[in-house]
Amino acid sequence: MATNYSANQYEKPFSPKYLQNWSLAKPTKERISSHEGYTQIIANDRGHLLPSVPRSKASPWGSFMGTWQMPLKVPPARATLTSRTAAGAASLTRWIQKNPDLLKASNGLRPEIFGKPHDPDSQKKLRKSITKTVQQAPSPTIIPSSPASNLSSPDQLQSSHPSAGHTPGPQSPLNSPKCPPGSPCLPHAGRNLAEV
């Protein structure tokens, strides 16, 4: 034991002389007054509840689900059905709703499901109907209000495509390097542009 040990060695800093608080001390009772009621013993000395104490069926932790109560694979919290087939989307939603305890738990899953699944059969039917309409398209006709309808030869027809005739593309001049002068690819070989 240390030679300079004193039982009240830590009391000196809290004395009024050092704290310099010269206020009056609070009056204390010689004997404390008794409280109303009594202490009910509900546990033994080891902290276990006595058998006479009524127990609640509910967990004291509420609906919290621990790691060992959770399923081995937890479904995703945000599921997108957009790029899935109808069977895949049904399987995913069944998996999410399979464990109701996980959905009800306070720390459980709050799933958000977005999008609609696509049906490959309806996609095939849609593609077939599109190809049928393309194959059954009417023959091309001349659009009278189109600026391109004032062509030099009447056998040049306009396309039935909606964008045809609205914005004509760049026209190559007759003396283009692709067709040499005097070749049969020109409609009027040897003529000037001013004559046509």
Curated annotation (Swiss-Prot):
Record localization:
Cytoplasm, Cytoskeleton, Cilium basal body; Cell projection, Cilium; Apical cell membrane; Cytoplasm, Cytoskeleton, Cilium axoneme
Does the UniProt entry include the keyword Acetylation? no
What are the boundaries of the region Disordered? 107-196
| Composition skew (Low complexity), residue ranges | 137-149
- Enumerate composition-biased segments (Basic and acidic residues): 113-124
* Biological process annotations from GO: cilium organization; flagellated sperm motility
Subunit (UniProt): Microtubule inner protein component of sperm flagellar doublet microtubules. Interacts with DLG3.
**Entry's family note:** Belongs to the Flattop family.
Alphabetical list of PANTHER family matching this protein: PROTEIN FLATTOP
Protein name as it appears in the record: Protein Flattop
Q: Which gene encodes it?
A: CFAP126
